[in-house]
C-alpha cells in the first residue's frame, strides 16, 4: 500500500460500498485514518448521492432489518434490531444512510446499518404540565441540519385530557435532540400551532407520524378526521432555526379524506387517494413557490390489493422512466411506468409486516458510538497517570485499549 499513490487509493476506496470499506479499515493505519476522516466520509456520501451507486431498499420489520440492493435484488442482508428489548422496534426515518430507531418515546437511537454504529439517545421524559393530561400520539422525525452540520431527532407529543376533564387546547410538547451536543431541548410552540394538534380534529396513522426531510425542514401531515369541519394541514420544522410553521398547498386538497406526504426526487409530494380506485400524486417543484404545486400523475389501484390504505414513492429509476412505489406495505413494492401509466412488481419478496425505505450505503455514522463506551473512554482519561506504565510491555506502535 505504501507504494501505491495516495490519490489512487482514495479514488479506489470512493468506489466501494460502505460495508466493504468498514473491512478495509484494518488493512493498515493509513487506510484506517483515510476511511475515518471527515473529508473522505463526505466525499464518499457525495458520490453515492450524485451517482446513485449502491442504493439499497431497507425493509423494516418489527424485529429485523433487511437490506436489498436496488440493482441486484438477489443480494439480501439481515440485520438484527440493535435496540431489541423484547418488544417491537420502529424505524422512524432514514437520511444519508442513517436511520432512527424507537422502542418507546424515551428509548431511541440513531443507527447506521452499513457500519453497524449506534448512538443511543439520552433518556428524555415527557413533561406533562398537569396531572389530568396523558399522552396520545407521538410524532418523530430524523433529519440532518446542513447549516449546523448536525443530525437531529424531533419528538412531538400530542397530549389528551383524562376522561371527564375539559381544557382547550390540549398541550403539545416539542423536544429536539442534537447529536453534536448529545442533549435534548424543548421548543416553544405558538398557540395557533397547538390548535392544529387537537385530537378531535386529526387522526394519525402510525406511519404518518414520521417526518420527511426536504430543504432542511422536517414535514408532517395532519390529516383531518372524516366528517369533521376541518382542513388538512402540513407542519414544517426548520432544522437550523427550530422554527415551526405551516407549508401551503393547493386549496382543492384541504378537504381530501385520504392524504399522505412523502419525498419524490428531492421534492415534497402529496398522495391523495380513492382507496378503491386510484392515487393522485402532487409535487412541490420549487420549495419556496406555492404556485409550483403540480399534479404529476394518477396511479391506478393494483389488482393485487383490495384497497389502497397507504402509498409512498421511494425513488426514481436511473433513466427516470419509472418510480418505485410502496403500496400499503413492503410486500407490494411496484414500479410505476410514467409513460404507460402501468404497474409491475419489483420482485422483492417479504411479508406484510415489513415496510420499506431507501437507504444510502454511507460511512456517515450520524453517531459518536454508544454513550456508555464514550463514558468509559472519558473515565479512562481521568485515571491517575501511574496507570499508563502498563503500556510499556506492548510492541512499538501499539496501545493498550481498555
Swiss-Prot record:
Transmembrane segments: none annotated. It comes from the Eukaryota. Residues 1-49 form the F-box domain. This is F-box protein At4g22390. PANTHER family: BNACNNG10540D PROTEIN, F-BOX PROTEIN CPR30-LIKE.
